[in-house]
């Protein structure tokens, strides 16, 4: 892998282009094998850009998480319109991959667009899963289904170094796990419910250029250990 803005190795570029083509040709379904290969290629790029500008590193972090999201989707999984938008952003502005070297402003704009499309989609899905538990607070299956999306969101936000939202996710994971372990489902659902609007508040503030911490009293409630 090369420095941002320079030509990437032919073998890597050929593999990336071929996997992306296979992924897009697979529509209207998600091709998990192509997504897995693209995730690996993004991880290679991320490892080679540890000393690069922050937006370059974060570009590959988000791209890797996006392809991991596609790979983890249940098969067969329908292709979404926002998937196409993110793929187009990656192809057009990936440092060292685009036909012409992107400027720092272009990289920042692409990163912002990827964030708005991908992270918001992740949060919306997580919100829908959490709502199913809120609607059926005694349902252990509904509570258990919250674990995967919450853990995936926690990993994504942690890699993006969004500490406040990461801390909120960690506390929520503790709440869900404790509710399942102690058969405290209804009380756990009640404690977990405020985490959704709090996450949306933090997300909107981040999109507006602010980084805020979650309500400490809410984090304490989520970390409460049932007796």
Report residues per predicted region.
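Extended, low-complexity, amphipathic alpha-helical coiled-coil/linker regions that act as scaffolds
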Residues: 1-227
């Amino acid at each position: 892998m090369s420095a941002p803005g320079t030509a990437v190795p032919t073998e890597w570029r050929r593999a990336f282009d071929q996997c992306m083509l296979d992924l897009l040709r697979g529509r209207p379904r998600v091709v998990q094998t192509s997504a897995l290969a693209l995730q690996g290629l993004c991880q290679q790029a991320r490892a080679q850009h540890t000393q690069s500008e922050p937006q370059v590193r974060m570009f590959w972090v988000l791209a890797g998480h996006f392809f991991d999201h596609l790979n983890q989707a249940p098969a067969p999984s329908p292709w979404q319109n926002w998937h196409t938008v993110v793929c187009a952003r990656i192809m057009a502005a990936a440092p060292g991959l685009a036909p012409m070297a992107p400027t720092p402003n272009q990289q920042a704009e692409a990163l912002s667009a990827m964030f708005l499309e991908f992270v918001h989609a992740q949060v919306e899905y997580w919100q829908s899963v959490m709502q199913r538990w809120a609607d059926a607070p005694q349902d252990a299956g509904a509570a258990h289904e919250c674990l995967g999306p919450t853990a995936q969101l926690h990993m994504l936000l942690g890699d993006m170094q969004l500490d406040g939202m990461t801390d909120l996710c960690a506390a929520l994971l503790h709440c869900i796990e404790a509710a399942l372990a102690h058969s405290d489902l209804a009380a756990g659902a009640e404690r977990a419910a405020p985490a959704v609007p709090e996450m949306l508040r933090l997300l909107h503030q981040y999109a507006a250029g602010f980084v805020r911490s979650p309500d400490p009293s809410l984090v304490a409630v989520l970390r409460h250990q049932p007796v």
